[in-house]
């Protein structure tokens, strides 16, 4: 799916790459859409686990947010198909697409709420904040992780965390 897109991907090729017979493929999945949904769910879970580990390892929430920006750019560089597969899911399997972002936003908002409880950030609508930060990270990952790898992720993370922590207010 990552190389050719959903519509050009063939079950025979998927089975060949997975080193299974086509009949065995149908033991686990009843259609190409079913395997695509499973792939979206799997990639989504892998992404959430990777970014959660980065946040948890940080000394505080703002340091964690900065680390997540850099880590997400690196994740996108190593998993270039992720952006394409998730974007395609909007058209192929809207339920998987929405589930990906809904789970991500809910876990992110819960994590922000915990950080507020520890006194690491201000109060506010954590769900709105989660969606805003996720949106920023998605486009930073696309631009600097998938389209062009020349920028240093640390530099991008510095600019991103400045926006998160200071906003656009003049200093």
List where the protein language model places each region:
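Short, basic, alpha-helical segments at the C-terminal edge of helix-turn-helix-like DNA-binding modules
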Residues: 11, 41-47
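Helix-turn-helix
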Residues: 2-34, 38
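Hydrophobic alpha-helical connector segments
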Residues: 38, 52-78, 129, 133
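Amphipathic alpha-helical packing segments from all-alpha helical-bundle domains
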Residues: 45-52, 75-78, 94-120, 127-132, ...
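Amphipathic alpha-helical segments used for helix-helix packing
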Residues: 73-95, 139-146
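Short coil/turn segments at alpha/beta junctions that flank glycine-rich nucleotide-binding fingerprints
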Residues: 3-7, 58, 79, 118-119
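C-terminal effector-binding regulatory domain of bacterial HTH transcription factors
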Residues: 171
